[in-house]
A protein has these predicted regions:
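C-terminal structured "cap/appendage" subdomains that terminate the fold
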Residues: 145-172
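C-terminal outer-membrane beta-barrel translocator/porin domains of Gram-negative envelope proteins
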Residues: 1-135, 139-149, 153
Length: 172
């Protein structure tokens, strides 16, 4: 049996006081090499193009959301990380913002009760644990993507996550 996958492609045109096109490509693949372990892979690209794609009235895209690259949320930075800049910017944080982004995620998911010999697949609590690795980058036309060198834009994180399902919905 082939492993399930999902591909979403979207183009959206905005016309009015702002004119730009947004493009989204999202690819996901799920493989269960041995029950109850599942490998989940995801690659995503989003970009805004056109004359107003980087207009100051638009909120920049941000790769630090938990469903993109975990561990880089707005409150995870100390002001000391920004260094002394003359314009008040924070280069460490600014690399998470742009009009385009690319993200890759990999997870090994399993229910701990079922993985460690429990008689029931999920056990008394519908808990799922995931070991994850995330990576991503955001950029603009004025600040092109740099994947090499000292000032590269790629951010990465690894860790452990847990989810509890209630009536089929992940709640934590």
């Amino acid at each position: 049996m082939k492993a399930p996958f999902l591909v979403a492609v979207s183009l959206h045109q905005t016309n009015g006081s702002l004119t730009y096109t947004s493009a989204l490509t999202d690819y996901r693949k799920y493989v269960m090499p041995v029950r109850p372990f599942t490998i989940a892979l995801r690659g995503m690209y989003y970009g805004r193009f056109g004359s107003s794609a980087e207009d100051a009235r638009l909120t920049p895209v941000f790769i630090g959301y938990p469903d993109l690259v975990r561990g880089y949320d707005y409150n995870s930075f100390d002001p000391l990380e920004c260094g002394n800049t003359t314009d008040g910017s924070c280069p460490v944080f600014d690399r998470l913002l742009g009009s385009r982004l690319i993200v890759g995620n990999a997870e090994l998911r399993f229910p701990p009760w079922g993985a460690f010999g429990g008689s029931s697949f999920y056990g008394p609590i519908p808990l799922e644990v995931a070991l994850f690795a995330d990576a991503g980058a955001a950029w603009t036309r004025q600040r092109p993507l740099r994947l090499t060198g000292v000032n590269r834009d790629l951010v990465r994180s690894v860790g452990v996550a847990a989810r509890i399902n209630v009536l089929g919905f992940a709640v934590a």
